[in-house]
Swiss-Prot record:
Topological domains annotated Extracellular: 38-161
Source organism: Sus scrofa (Pig)
Gene this protein is translated from: CTLA4
Parts of the chain on the Cytoplasmic side: 183-223
PTM comment, free text: N-glycosylation is important for dimerization. Phosphorylation at Tyr-201 prevents binding to the AP-2 adapter complex, blocks endocytosis, and leads to retention of CTLA4 on the cell surface.
Protein name per Swiss-Prot or TrEMBL: Cytotoxic T-lymphocyte protein 4
Length: 223
């Protein structure tokens, strides 16, 4: 009995010695996630422009200086969170979103300037900036309160062919109106000139006076 108890105790010690490195690694990786928080600030409201582009700044603060950072943009719709885009970059290099052309950004010190493109009215919602400081340890993670992005779809432009038809109709109407006014004006001018002359020259005989005086010669006799 003593021998069997000693064997079981030895097996437990051997199992503990084998699993201790894994337990220590687990503790080093996951305990800092919950113990090292980070504040992330972002604007409360942003209005996208007419082309569906919205820009906002994510500013994070931490005690250490990170060399490798990961930025993730999340969209909250009700109780669900969906990832819009994400990128991992080093402080020395430029922030680039390789897998998604929806987002672009630049980084300066502890600020990340994010731009989201191709937004429509249905994309209006709360966009949350998540920042992770990956290297060097310890691991920091923080999420902002979110930026409410409002998107207004621009009114559709009218068809260019339709505009051409309208322009042609208006031009034709103006031309017909000017032609009608010109014709009426010429007609009135001709009517005014008709009582003055018929346009045909007729040679008329000279007229004699109705009453022509007759003069008798008057002679004075000379003796």
């Amino acid at each position: 009995m003593a021998c069997s108890g000693f064997q079981s105790h030895g097996a437990w010690l051997e199992l503990t010695s084998r699993t201790w490195p894994c337990t220590a690694l687990f503790s080093l990786l996951f305990i800092p996630v919950f113990s090292k928080g980070m504040h992330v600030a972002q604007p409360a409201v942003v209005l996208a422009n007419s082309r569906g582009v919205a820009s906002f700044v994510c500013e994070y603060g931490s005690a250490g200086k990170a060399a490798e950072v990961r930025v993730t943009v999340l969209r909250r719709a009700g109780s669900q969170m969906t990832e819009v885009c994400a990128a991992t970059y080093t402080v020395e290099d430029e922030l680039t979103f390789l897998d998604d052309s929806t987002c672009t950004g630049t980084s300066t010190e502890n600020k990340v300037n994010l731009t989201i493109q191709g937004l429509r009215a249905v994309d209006t919602g709360l966009y949350i900036c998540k920042v992770e400081l990956l290297y060097p340890p310890p691991y920091y993670v923080g999420m902002g309160n979110g930026t409410q992005i409002y998107v207004i779809d621009p009114e559709p432009c009218p068809d260019s062919d339709f505009l051409l038809w309208i322009l042609a109709a208006v031009s034709s109407g103006l031309f017909f109106y000017s032609f009608l006014i010109t014709a009426v004006s010429l007609s009135k001018m001709l009517k005014k000139r008709s009582p003055l002359t018929t346009g045909v020259y007729v040679k008329m005989p000279p007229t004699e006076p109705e009453c022509e005086k007759q003069f008798q010669p008057y002679f004075i006799p000379i003796n």
